[in-house]
Amino acid sequence: EFRRVLFRSFGSASYKEVCADISAYGKYGSMELTDTAKEIILEKAAEKIGINRYTIEQTSRDNVETMQLSQNGENGSVLCRFITIHQENVEYEQYLYIGVTLKNTVDASFTYEKLIRQIMEEMQIDTEVNVNLKGQIHGALTDTQKEQFAQDMLDMMNAKLSVGRHMEDVYTVYAYNKGIKNYIMIGKDKVNVNICIGYDEEKNETTVYLATPMNMQDY
């Protein structure tokens, strides 16, 4: 299965630290909901994810109302947001965001990816679920080493390189694997694998990001 290959390719290096972020964001429905309904939706999402020690808070700023459910722990965190945007003379918009962060492991990433996908599908929200794996390596890599590192990962995944680009200290790769059902288009190319390799001079650390279909984090 491709997920196992993805983990194996990511885990082929000796990382100091690893973490994973799994998230999805999409437009919700055509009927404006009450605060009670929003809270029920967030609580049902939390129940499906498997958390019960969460807190819920509501904020309002300018034309944006946000109801947020969150739970933090030593091994990770969960953040669910129901966002309502009101603009004068414009129809309101509602969005649902669900994010799970795992610390010190990436093993359960695709379990949560499946859960979040199910939640979004049940709510008839058309969106992509992003899985971002992140690891730190001590020291710097040359541009050639970054290219080889990324190519080795692609080879293990049987993914075809679409674009590879150096920008300052970051090497970014966009690729496609036909074993992954979902993809996005960059120009005329299908893309569903994204690798970013960057360097932090102060920490003397190289950070590797492996995402499907696209890295949504700062690097």
Language model: regions and residue ranges:
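Short Lys/Arg-enriched alpha/beta "domain-start" segment
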Residues: 7-70, 74
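Soluble, non-membrane globular domain cores that form compact, hydrophobic packing
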Residues: 9, 87-92, 110, 117-128, ...
